[in-house]
């Protein structure tokens, strides 16, 4: 089997790439996976409290503007608030009724409607909270006290590395709060 694969690599002029680049990278990736990355648990706990407070303020603002409470995570309830209670224009429809997806909320917000803008903010903060701030501390290995990702050398067709379980290459950077989350990753004492 090895002989056949080597022959295929040579035929495709990939033999040197495999020997000179890909194979030497394997022990480096193994070392990185075993080392893991540290996080500051107190930082994430504080960040969680901050996000919960901000989410609550946004929730209160939405409820005031909407004229009452509703489940912000319920598409049918949001649809009712936006298109029936507030009588906002329907931008696009789905099989079940007017859409409340991100592009619709963006378009409505651009027209000056406050509830769609607040819903965008709410969804963004809620995703950051649930996907990163709440989830990452739960992934700390009991024995090492670090998060251990898997680096995937052969998944992306472009040859780029990818990361999974968790994907540590996907930590947000576009927003201020996204960048703040990155501050929760810490190096070992004496490593910087």
Predicted regions and their residues:
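Conserved "right-hand" nucleotidyltransferase catalytic core of DNA-directed polymerases
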Residues: 1-178, 187-191
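Intrinsically disordered, low-complexity, charge-biased tails
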Residues: 183-184
């Amino acid at each position: 089997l090895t002989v056949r694969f080597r022959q295929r690599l040579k035929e495709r002029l990939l033999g040197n790439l495999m020997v000179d680049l890909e194979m030497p990278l394997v022990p480096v990736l193994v070392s990185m996976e075993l080392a893991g990355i540290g996080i500051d648990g107190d930082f994430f706990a504080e960040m969680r409290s901050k996000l919960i407070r901000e989410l609550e303020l946004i929730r209160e603002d939405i409820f005031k503007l909407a004229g009452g409470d509703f489940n912000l995570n319920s598409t049918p309830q949001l649809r009712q608030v936006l298109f029936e209670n507030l009588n906002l224009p329907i931008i696009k429809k789905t099989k079940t009724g007017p859409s409340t997806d991100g592009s619709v909320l963006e378009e409505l917000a651009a027209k000056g409607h406050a509830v769609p803008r607040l819903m965008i903010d709410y969804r963004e903060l809620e995703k950051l909270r649930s996907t990163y701030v709440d989830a990452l501390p739960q992934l700390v290995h009991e024995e090492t006290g670090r998060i251990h990702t898997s680096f995937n050398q052969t998944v992306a067709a472009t040859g780029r590395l990818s990361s999974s379980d968790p994907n540590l290459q996907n930590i947000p950077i576009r927003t201020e709060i996204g960048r703040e989350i990155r501050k929760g990753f810490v190096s070992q004492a004496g490593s910087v």
